[in-house]
């Protein structure tokens, strides 16, 4: 069976993903802010590095899969937090564990949404991040 790491594995889509993978007999490392096998705050550089370091220590032989599901919605009220977690958290973990995925020819799935456009950000900023502004101007 495979070895999978899931960010945001204690809630929502991430929790269901962990449940299904375990049911199939895979080893799953749940990465979450409070209740994970690896606990870390992916909004911070330190938290991201902790995840990368711990995954390398736990499975230097590689990962079969990485699922990036950790995210916050516009309801959190902080554009900085949304971008720090939903974008930079995911990108940093992908880049930092890419070598582990390569070792086992593993796959990476990044879960995303259009939360940035839900009344929390200026629409010109949201359009830039969504790459829509070039078509409109």
Regions found by a protein language model. Name each.
Residues 67, 93-101:
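Hydrophobic positions on the long internal alpha-helix
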Residues 72-76, 80, 104-137:
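Catalytic loop of short-chain dehydrogenase/reductase
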Residues 7-10, 14-19:
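N-terminal Rossmann NAD(P)H-binding glycine-rich loop of SDR-like oxidoreductase domains
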Residues 33-47:
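Rossmann-fold cofactor-recognition segment
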């Amino acid at each position: 069976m495979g070895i999978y790491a899931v960010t945001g594995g204690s809630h929502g889509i991430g929790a269901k993903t962990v449940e299904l993978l375990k049911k199939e007999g895979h080893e799953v490392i749940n990465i979450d802010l409070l209740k994970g096998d690896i606990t870390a705050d992916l909004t911070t550089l330190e938290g991201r590095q902790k995840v990368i370091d711990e995954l390398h220590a736990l499975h230097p032989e590689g990962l079969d899969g990485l699922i990036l599901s950790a995210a916050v919605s516009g309801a959190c009220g902080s554009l900085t937090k949304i971008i720090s977690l939903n974008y930079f958290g995911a990108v940093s973990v992908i880049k930092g564990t890419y070598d582990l995925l390569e070792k086992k020819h593993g796959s990476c799935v990044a879960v995303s949404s259009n939360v940035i456009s839900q009344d929390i950000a200026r629409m010109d900023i949201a359009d830039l991040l969504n790459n829509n502004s070039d078509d409109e101007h």
